[in-house]
Amino acid sequence: MTPDIRVVIPARYASTRLPAKPLALIGGVPMIVRTAQQVAQAGFPYCVAYDDERIGDVLAAHHIPAIKTRFTHENGTQRLSEVVIARAWTDETIVVNVQGDEPLLPPDLITTVARTLIEHTQASVATLATVCDAPESPNTVKVVCDCAGYALYFSRSVMPYVRDAAAPPVSYLRHIGIYAYRVQLLKRYPQLAPTPLEQAEKLEQLRFLEHGFKIAVAQIDEAPPAGVDSPEDLARVQALFVHE
């Protein structure tokens, strides 16, 4: 039986680098609305998990499904955990996490990451990667996988490290930050303590690996357009909608 697939879009008002980021206008439309419109095209039930009534008011005005969550969450996965528990979704349900600052996300990636989790029955999480041309940058998260497509490790460092020039060529894989989770894991997430590697690399997904959960990784042909993390990113995306 094919599991239910749902999409949750976490939206936090108090962004450090870009205050009130979900409400930033892109072609006259709030960013969180743009992101929700992209997600809706995938055809799965979805909702925005927000933490501030200013976001909630905008979502209501645009008739976007939403659920109010606590503002104390440290990350988007905690927010997802609150949603799946509040909605009493079954353990077999698959939840795709799309960040609220991804107004250009191709909707087909939602289907791809969900299908990856369905096909990898040993995995509790699935995510995506693509070939990386600049592995030296610590802002680019790399992933290495086993022969079955499960993640071995994620890092900001260059990996794999090629020691000898005569070694066979390897492809560096850049992680794409979209995730699919089994609800069973999200329900357990509040009990999973932060881990040393997670804290060292500042990579939330390492918590799952360190606690023994498998992450399936599907390779896609090209990276999606970058999300909005800074005022410069916002200006870049706004320029694409300048004539709307």
Curated annotation (Swiss-Prot):
CDD domains attached to this UniProt entry: CMP-KDO-Synthetase
Q: Which GO terms describe its cellular component?
A: cytosol
State where it is primarily located: cytoplasm
Family matches, as SUPFAM superfamilies? Nucleotide-diphospho-sugar transferases (SSF53448)
Record has Transferase as a keyword:
yes
User: Which reactions does this protein catalyse?
Assistant: 3-deoxy-alpha-D-manno-oct-2-ulosonate + CTP = CMP-3-deoxy-beta-D-manno-octulosonate + diphosphate
Under which pathway is this protein filed?
Answer: Nucleotide-sugar biosynthesis; CMP-3-deoxy-D-manno-octulosonate biosynthesis; CMP-3-deoxy-D-manno-octulosonate from 3-deoxy-D-manno-octulosonate and CTP: step 1/1; Bacterial outer membrane biogenesis; lipopolysaccharide biosynthesis
| GO BP | CMP-keto-3-deoxy-D-manno-octulosonic acid biosynthetic process; lipopolysaccharide biosynthetic process
Any one Gene Ontology MF annotation carried by this entry is: 3-deoxy-manno-octulosonate cytidylyltransferase activity
Protein keywords: Cytoplasm, Lipopolysaccharide biosynthesis, Nucleotidyltransferase, Transferase
The EC number(s) attached to this protein equal: 2.7.7.38
* Top-level EC class: transferase
One Pfam family name is CTP_transf_3
- Record has Transport as a keyword: no
What's the domain of life for this entry?
A: Bacteria
Role this protein plays: Activates KDO (a required 8-carbon sugar) for incorporation into bacterial lipopolysaccharide in Gram-negative bacteria.
Task: Please state what the protein is called.
Answer: 3-deoxy-manno-octulosonate cytidylyltransferase
- Source organism of the structure: Dichelobacter nodosus (strain VCS1703A)
Gene this protein is translated from: kdsB
